[in-house]
Each structure stands twice: as structure tokens, then as C-alpha cells.
Amino acid sequence: MRVAIVGAGLAGLAAAIDLVDAGHQVAIYDSRPFVGGKVGSWIDADGNHIEMGLHVFFFNYANLFALMRKVGAFENLLPKAHTHTFINKGGEVGELDFRFPIGAPFNGLKAFFTTSQLTWLDKLQNALALGTSPLVRGILDYEGAMKIIRALDRISFADWFRSHGGSEGSLKRMWNPIAYALGFIDTENISARCMLTVFQMFAAKTEASKLNLLAGSPAEYLHKPILDYIQARGATLHLRRRVREIEYTETNGQTVVTGLQIADGDAVERVEADVYLAACDVPGIQRLLPEAWRKWSEFDNIYKLDAVPVATVQLRFDGWVTELGDREKRHQLDHATGLDNLLYTADADFSCFTDLALSSPKDYYRKGQGSLLQCVLTPGDPFIAMKNEDIAQHVLKQVHELFPSSRDLNMTWSNVVKLAQSLYREAPGMDPFRPDQKTPIANFFLAGSYTQQDYIDSMEGATISGRRAAKAMLEAQAIAA
């Protein structure tokens, strides 16, 4: 079976792995000059590794981790301490510390009751909200709890949390930074289904909330092993190749895709396959689908989905920003030092950040240089129209507010990557509009983390969607045979 995949992000790559494993001929096309989609990275003219965003690998990414083990990339993950660290103004540190001799859900209870990020009243109200949630049922009946959680898509997490006795302090100081990190929108605008799904996964498995970062850039330490794997099994990759048009015929009420018109420089190439997979993000699939296909609700509903803007900022320093205690350590450049983990904050426009020179040193640590902070500005709306230099200075000012001791360090380099449309907006009531991977057209399938799957728009969600699409294609082929 010949398969043409449009989109070389994780969804398309995950589908390609299962398809080449089944012995099929796979060709992947992407308009960008690099693979990975929203997880993409590249090297600029000065040798700096630039990322589309900050990519964190939780231990509950079961499908992605299985993929990484298969292609030999799993050893490229660097596990971090099992804590979620919050940086508050003035360098005050709060933590959700999940390290506990007894596993889930008791390690989570310990983390919430011992955190300094919340007042005792907030902790009690937080316990009330979570204690009356489907998470309790999920300890014994995971699927039963998930059925309840899926039905909560219609309301925001903030509204659900308040209705169960949760406090404004918890929303502002803890849950908003986490919501921004997960979906790039706050708790007033993110679906309760989205947040509670993640909490359910964390509550069910002890290690689920523990995170990893890659040893270096996604291009080298995630995508290269995947490409090596699929290309060794006959897959081909075609970059800078934008699909201009989907060709199709309609006969006796049956629609069949017959080919793709794909740009090749100034020319256009016609590509034929037996089966086609559109592994795109929300704006990509909205541009790709023929207008006539909106007669089907499965396709028309896609246009009800929206994507959120984000800006990712990298700042290089001549010392170690997150080294809070020792001035001499902060200024030495012999080795990396500081907080080696993902960091959250409720006191800046970037909800989460890390020092890549410390947490992903293979590509980001440079001898004789210091921290490389990577900060994710969410919501990104106010920053899309701003000049990159102004954004960098804005972030630098907020870094100084979080880490006053960093004021005696110099910023030596900066970079800004803006995405006007990134993750799909997981707003209340949007879940019914997400399409299945199987479509009304027998030889045309969808993938991408906006498509139906329980996880959020994430690397794990993309992987699940790609694997579900590959399974649907293989089942369709078996039926046809």
C-alpha cells in the first residue's frame, strides 16, 4: 500500500512508524524546511539551536515513550527531580514535591498539603475540590472516571473548581500557570475536561507527573532517530513541499482522493498514493481541505476549532540566572549550576521556563557562557505584533523580578519565535468538534493532536492521533483485501 502523509510533525511520524512496520510504502511531505511541526527545531546562521517551543516529556507519555524506545531515542531523555517548582517574585520558591515513599495518589496528596505555594486555607479548599472530583473514583475505576470527565468539557476548569469549593488563590497561584503550560490559556478559558484528564493520569500512576527534558535539541535527539528508523525501512521525506490541492473524484456518491498537487520550487508535482493522511495542525488542515468537503459535518466542524498564539523567547546570559544562593557559583563559567527542572511562575507573562544550558546541555550548554533561558509567553496575543527586541527586553525585566540576583548578569543574546496559531484552543464545548481519524472518504484520514484522543494538544496527543490513524488505515486495507 502506498501512503502519502502530509505533515512531518509527531503525528505524521508516529503514523509512518506503524505503517513501515507493517511493510507499506510511505512518503512524507512538509512545507517547512525541517521536521517536527510544533516540536521542530533548527540551527541558525550562528550555530544556535532554535526551538518552536519548550518541550517537556512527562512519564505518562506512554505512547511517545514506546515510540522513542522503538527508534532508540528513549535514552536521550534526562529525568528531573519529581517536583513541580514555582518561582515567585523576589526569588521565592514554591514546590509541589511528589517525592514520597508511598505512591499515587498519596504522593500527590503529600505534594499539595506540603506546598508553600498556597496558604493553608487555599490548600483546604483545593483538597475539597479535588476530593469531590472524579479523580477519587478514578483510583478504582479509571474508565468510569474518564466518562464523567469527558462530560465536563462544556464548562471551564475555573467554573468547575469554584463549584467544588476551590479558591481564587489556588487558581491564581497554582492552576493558572499549569493551565498556561498545558494549553496556553488560563483556567477561565480551558475546558475542565482538559485539566481533569491530566490530573486523572497523574493520580493514577506514581511516576506520571514526573518529567524529563531532552538531552539536547528535538532535531537531533528526537527526530533524527525517528527519521533514521523509517528511512531505513523505505520511507521517503520531502521538505519545502506545500500541498496546493487535493484531487478527488465522486462516483455514485462515493468520494475518492486520486492525488495531490504539491509545489516543488516553482513547479508543481502530482503525487499519487493508495491512501492519504493529513497530519496537520488546525490552521494547516483548514487550509488544506477542499471547500466542497464541508458538506460533511466531520470536516465542517474543524472550522469551528481555533488555535492560540504563543511566543517562545531564548535569553543567553554571562552567568547562571537560577543559581539563587551563591554569588560565586552564579558568576563562574566552568560548569552549569542552578535549578535543573521545568519552572512555573504566576508572576510573569511566561508561565513556564527552564535553563536549557542546565536541563538540556548537549546542544545548549556552551563553554564559557551561562544560562540559556527558554520562556514561553502565554497568552501570546499581546506579543505577536511587538518587535522581537522589545519582547526580549520585556522578558528580561520579568526575569530580574523573579531572580533579583540576576540583575548583575548581562544578557548576551536573545531570540524570539512567534506562532500566531499554535495549539488548538481547548475551550469549553469544543471537544465535540474534534474529528475522528477516519473520515467519510474511504482513502483519506486525519491525524494531529486536535483530532479525537483523550490527551491534550501535546506530543503525546499527537503520537496517539498518528497511531490511531495508522490503525484505521491498516484496518481499512484489511477489509478491502
From Swiss-Prot:
EC number: 1.3.5.6
InterPro entries for this protein: Amino_oxidase, FAD/NAD-bd_sf, Zeta_caro_desat, Zeta_carotene_desat/Oxidored
Note accompanying the cofactor annotation: Lipophilic quinones such as decyl-plastoquinone or decyl-ubiquinone.
UniProt keyword terms in alphabetical order: Carotenoid biosynthesis, Oxidoreductase
Pathway: Carotenoid biosynthesis; lycopene biosynthesis
Top-level taxonomic group: Bacteria
Pfam family, one: Amino_oxidase
Cofactors, names only: decylplastoquinone; 6-decylubiquinone
BP term (GO), one: carotenoid biosynthetic process
Gene3D superfamilies cross-referenced by the UniProt entry: FAD/NAD(P)-binding domain
Gene Ontology MF: a single term: 9,9'-di-cis-zeta-carotene desaturase activity
Function: Catalyzes the conversion of zeta-carotene to lycopene via the intermediary of neurosporene.
Family listed: Belongs to the zeta carotene desaturase family.
Protein name: Probable zeta-carotene desaturase
